[in-house]
Structures are given as structure tokens and as C-alpha cells.
Amino acid sequence: EEAQQCIREYKPVDGLKKESKYEKEIEEYMDCLFQKNTKKAIALIRKYVDRGIDLDDIYVEILSESMRRVGELWHTAEITVDTEHYCTSVTQMAMAQMYDLLFDGARKNKTILSVCPGMELHEMGARIVTDLFENHGWDSIFLGAAVPVDYILDAVSENHPDLVTLS
């Protein structure tokens, strides 16, 4: 009940309103998150894959948009940090469930290195970008969060990626 109310009352911050052709899927997914139903949330994302929704659309239009809305709800104090972290954790699990599907296409012999430098702990954006590049044939080196700059430079020097992304 509380989850449904939170979703129904969702009003984007001015300038961030985004209409989506996947509004129904976003609402279903966020409902699972706010009900703290991990199993159902993961199954729902699998259902979207089985329905033939493109992985790019699942990542960008459904998962990213859901997380943007969750972040906005946290920012406006409509949800607490523990709920925001739970939603992030479940979304990371959902993404991991799709990981093997990212390698179905032809490879491009290109490499992306993605990292969150310094004290940046929020790695989901970098993970999404990295997975999208994998889905389009790139190999990836994902270093994760809070990596000191010297180690980033070492990784670039050792691996010679075609593209480096910082988040």
C-alpha cells in the first residue's frame, strides 16, 4: 500500500521529467523494490528479457530510469537511505542476471576501461555504461568504485584500452 502510494505520488523534480514508453514496466519494477520483494523484482526483469525487450532498453529505459527516480525520492526525503541502497542492490543483482546475454553479439576487438575515481562510491552508472559497451561487442575492464588515480593510470598503461570512462 505504501509502495503504491509512493509510486502514484511520484512527481519528478522540475526539468527531470521523462516520459517513457516503458512506464508500466518501470512502475511494476519500482513496486517490487518498494515492497522489498527481491525475488519478484529479479523475475520481472527476466520476464522483460523473455518478452524480447532489448537489453539496451532494459538497462537505460527501465533500470536506469527506475534508479533515477529512486535517487530523486531519496533526495526529496520521500524514502530513506536504506531503501535507496536496497533498490540499488536489487538492481545490481538484476543486471548480474543478464550478464551472460551481453556477449551474444559479434565482438569488435575494442576495450573499454571503466572506473569511479577517488572517493566516488556510486558505481552503478559506470557499470551500466560498461555493460552497454559489452552488449555492443566491446571487451571491458571494470575497476569499480573508489579507485585511487595512480592505480587508474597503471591500469590504463597496462591494458591500453580504446576508451576510458570515469564516473
Task: Label each residue range with its predicted role.
Residues E1-D104:
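Long amphipathic alpha-helical segments
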Residues D54, D139, D162:
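Residue-level detector of anion-binding/catalytic polar loops
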Residues A106-K108:
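Short, flexible hinge/linker loops that cap or flank conserved catalytic cores
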Residues T111-L113:
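Conserved beta-strand elements of the Class I
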Residues P117-H122:
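Short coil/turn segments
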Residues R127-I141:
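Short helix-loop-beta junction
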Residues F142, V147-S167:
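Cofactor-cradling patches in redox/metallo enzymes
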